[in-house]
């Protein structure tokens, strides 16, 4: 959220962090778990569909998927590099299962479910959405890298501020204002 605010309004990142923290805290305290749940639902919808809509605009700007493939080195398209082995994959799975399923943000939603069946259904749906969602930012990241490589997106901004600015910069350079607004509304 702070990154989006920083890019859109041109304010310092630290000021954006403070601003977002104050707004989110007030909203969550005044509305409780119900307001947070509603916000989660709207955010998931806007982020997933906003990013899906973003792909065609970004591909049009870069000149199509063939240009992405032609611009980037082959190794950028490998899902697993040589440093990842079965032990690493198992360790990551154990770490994610042990941390995300017992985190406060997840547990509070389990206990807020109407009944056990709703908790299981919600967890399964969230897992399915996360599996689908895992690939969308990857595609957008590859397109952004191609646009930085060919000079459409200035490399100095990414080098100065880091990769956290990749999605906002991609959006600002490739998408109409309405799509940017929907996407950023979901992220914020």
Region spans (language model):
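Interfacial helix-loop-helix linkers and transmembrane-helix boundary segments
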Residues: 35-42
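Helix-loop-helix connectors at the membrane interface of multi-pass transporters/channels
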Residues: 1-16, 112, 169, 173
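Gly/Ser/Thr-rich beta-alpha loop segments that engage phosphate groups in nucleotides
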Residues: 33-34, 143, 188
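Short intrinsically disordered, low-complexity coil segments enriched in acidic
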Residues: 1-6, 61, 187-188
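Transmembrane alpha-helical segments of multi-pass small-molecule transport proteins
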Residues: 5-35, 184
